[in-house]
Amino acid sequence: MNVPTAPTPNKHLNIPDLRFEKVFKKALHRELAPSSSLSRKAGVITKVVVRDVLLMPLLQSFVLSLALMGVKEWLSYIRLKGRTLGDRIRQRLFPI
């Protein structure tokens, strides 16, 4: 006889919704009040479009570019040290 077991809690990470339309509509519903006037709705739509389509990608790419510029010097230093360490190991293992 099969005994039903209690459902196990979902231990997986929730993946964020990356579909633009659903996220955009959710942002609009969050910003709009149900009894807003037409001019208020146009202003809110403009605000959401400017924020979600223009400003956030611009800000994200700016921060990523700054981070990559900051890491560039460190990565070139690590590459140089790795190359010299590799040369020393090769010379000790295979002397000419």
From Swiss-Prot:
Localization per Swiss-Prot or TrEMBL: Membrane
UniProt topology in membrane: Single-pass membrane protein
Keywords on record: Membrane, Transmembrane, Transmembrane helix
InterPro entries the UniProt entry points to: Atg43 (IPR013898)
GO molecular function per UniProt: mitochondrion autophagosome adaptor activity
Keyword flag Transmembrane helix: yes
Membrane-crossing segments per the record: 53-71
Biological-process GO terms, alphabetical: mitophagy
GO cellular component: membrane
Stated name of the protein: Uncharacterized protein YFR035W-A
